[in-house]
């Protein structure tokens, strides 16, 4: 009986012990889960410190120097602008008109023009430029490594530079045609205005182009200490537009037309029969606008008007 009683007591005691263990196991699991959960928790300031350098690095890679003058800022300027102006670090007391003349030469480089002597020295390094384009980044960087060569006359009021237009490798090299690629850039300082004229080289009878610029609008009279030279310049996007629109692009188009090179893709590169098909949709006032573009379009616009008058009379 005693043995049976002890077995019964042991049998009754067993569930009691297992129940306590079952209650302890969930508590241990919860504690383990809590311990495991606390291992991955990070302070917010630590996460931010690891991310900030990455954001700064990504931002710095996106900020690069612009390609052309019109996109220049006080912090970032084109590489060719920096190269050319660094050669004039000791000439900070130059007149503001002369600085504006140098900016004009930078725009000329972007439009496919170069100073003649520089062209002769760097000709073997210059890449061909097609007739329907003008900007070549590699050419501009190479040519900007040389100083701008120009004459200064009449007490620092007149600046004269001889330019040459860049073309592709298939351009003819006859003397008469090469002369058509030469032009003269002259800037005259008149008070606060700089009169800039781009004329074909003699004996050409083709017209020239000119524009008047306000010196103080684009170049400040004061140079800040410990600041780059280009901090004096303002509204370079407007300056670039004025020079390209009124000087360099019209002159380049005129030179290419004189050499009978098609400015494709453009209206000047179409077959002759297509001009009449296009111009017949224009009224008289629109034809007059087209006729003032150049002699080529003037001829076709007048032919369309003549055919209209002839058809109306018949």
Swiss-Prot record:
Alphabetically ordered keywords of this record: Cytoplasm
GO molecular function, a single term: ubiquitin-like ligase-substrate adaptor activity
Inactivation phenotype: Male sterility.
InterPro entries membership: F-box-like_dom_sf, F-box_dom
Keyword Cytoplasm: yes
Predominant cellular place of this UniProt entry's protein: cytoplasm
Gene3D superfamilies linked: 3.40.1000.30
Coiled-coil ranges per UniProt: none
Domain F-box residue range list: 264-309
Record-linked SUPFAM superfamilies: F-box domain
Top-rank taxon: Eukaryota
Comp. bias (Low complexity): 21-34
Gene Ontology annotations for the cellular component aspect, listed alphabetically: cytoplasm; SCF ubiquitin ligase complex
Subcellular location: Cytoplasm
A matching Pfam family: F-box
Region Required for interaction with skpA and Cul1, but not with PI31: start-end pairs: 257-314
Tissue: Expressed in testis (at protein level).
Segments of this protein annotated with the region Disordered: 1-62
GO biological process: positive regulation of mitophagy; protein stabilization; protein ubiquitination; SCF-dependent proteasomal ubiquitin-dependent protein catabolic process; sperm individualization
Oligomeric and partner information: Component of an SCF (SKP1-CUL1-F-box protein) E3 ubiquitin-protein ligase complex, at least composed of ntc, skpA and Cul1. Interacts (via F-box domain) with skpA and Cul1. Interacts with Prosalpha7 and PI31. Interacts with Bruce.
Function: Functions together with PI31 to control non-apoptotic caspase activation during sperm individualization. Positively regulates PI31 stability.
Record protein name field: Protein nutcracker
Organism: Drosophila melanogaster
Chain's gene name: ntc
